């Protein structure tokens, strides 16, 4: 029998695939609002602009995951700095969201998130 519709464990309902971060995350109001804005952009404006991102994951996927992992303030700054780097003279290639933030990052020094998201 074909096992295409089953998840890796081989049992249960088919696994749902998504282009965004699918791990469990705390759904605080800020995170829900931030990820909703990113998802709105993905559904509406992204298809009009076209595929022009130089990174993997794309900038909108990066922003979604950064907000889901680290909250609206930290993840929003990381997503903004990623979009700024995604230009003709910017970086390119594989650039994942850090799993944990450094302890020297302070909420009142948002420009330090540039260094965090560029690694």
Swiss-Prot record:
Membrane topology of this protein: Peripheral membrane protein
InterPro entries in alphabetical order: Membr_insert_effic_factor_YidD (IPR002696)
Keyword Cell membrane: yes
Top-level division of the source organism's lineage: Bacteria
Subcellular location: Cell inner membrane
KW Cytoplasm (keyword) present: no
Signal sequence coordinates: none
Keywords: Cell inner membrane, Cell membrane, Membrane
Gene Ontology cellular-component annotations: plasma membrane
Function noted in UniProt: Could be involved in insertion of integral membrane proteins into the membrane.
Family: Belongs to the UPF0161 family.
Name of the molecule in the record: Putative membrane protein insertion efficiency factor
């Amino acid at each position: 029998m074909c096992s295409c519709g089953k998840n890796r464990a081989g049992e249960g309902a088919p696994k749902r695939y998504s282009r965004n971060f699918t791990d469990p995350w705390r759904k605080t109001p800020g995170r829900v609002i931030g990820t909703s804005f990113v998802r709105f952009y993905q559904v509406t404006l992204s298809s009009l602009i076209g595929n022009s991102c130089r990174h993997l994951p794309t900038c909108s996927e990066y922003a979604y995951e950064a907000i889901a992992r680290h909250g609206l303030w930290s993840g929003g700054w990381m997503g903004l700095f990623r979009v700024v780097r995604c230009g003709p003279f910017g970086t390119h290639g594989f650039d994942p969201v850090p799993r944990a933030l450094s302890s020297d990052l302070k909420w009142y020094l948002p420009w330090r998130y540039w260094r965090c998201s560029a690694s």
